[in-house]
Amino acid sequence: LPERQPPRHLAIQINQALHDLLCKYPSSLLFGEDVAQKGGVYTVSKGLLKAFGPRRVFNTLLDETMILGMAQGLANLGMLPIPEIQYLAYLHNAADQLRGEACSLQFFSNDQYRNPMLVRIAGLGYQKGFGGHFHNDNSITALRDIPGLVVGCASRGDDAAMMLRTLAALAQVDGRVAVFLEPIALYMTKDLHAAGDGQWLFPYPAPDQALVLGEGRVYAAEASDLVIFTYGNGVPMSLRAARTIEAELGWQVRVVDLRWLVPLNAGFIAEQGADAQRVLVVDEGRHSAGVGEGVITALVEAGLGHLPLQRVCGADTYTPLAGAAMCVLPSDNAVTSAARVLAQDH
């Protein structure tokens, strides 16, 4: 059983969680580009075709509009589709299938009709050796204002497994359209601070464990000198930066992994900011219309606009090729530099 295995990385635990979901929900189907025989570009769906057969795990055409359109049709027939969009940038070809069709059906039919689905999307930045905009898209803005949509993003394996269970239950029970955003650069990550430390490997959670919708993960909850809000690749980045900040400035640093990006849990954000001396928002998305804007808005609307605050985020541009990508994305050094600015000003 996976819960009896040693701690594992993100990709393996997503694979194990998908296996569990296909066992739990007999009506579930997993499909997308290269998900079957190949097991996905990053082997995340490896072995699922052999375990469940071609009627439940199958490849599709290279057409995201068709993939999401087929998911709606299958959902209307009583199935639980788990479609994969191979890369986040590819979603934009088919965004209206979510915005104008899938997410609006319950609303416009007064809940007479539902088309539940759990959409897996591999994305975000920092992927090395294979990239450019179409494989390292860091923007989820197109998903942020779709009514009824739920978007989760896990940065570590155990959270991923529990989040998938929650999203699948939301789809199956409430008929929700859910998106599970998978940070490609963290798929195989095992270490946090130094090579070989194994600090980004985690035990697989027992089958009865799931996440509470909207609840983030808090590291060093008692610390309040600086509170960092982040998600995805920003979580290990902020944890590494926190160690440097603590050594250099003598601050105790709390890191808050939002986990749930749509809708943002404003109450949770306000709760974490209430005792903060300073706030730093680390958002790998773009400067305009990114998740960070929502975090800051939640703090201001909770009456916390007086707090000293800095934001580290991606530039308003496309992700370039090779090492140039690092010039437009947040980094460990950018996070520590923002903390130094807060120290100078406050």
Region roles according to the model:
Residues 1-177, 181, 185-187, 194, ...:
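Thiamine diphosphate
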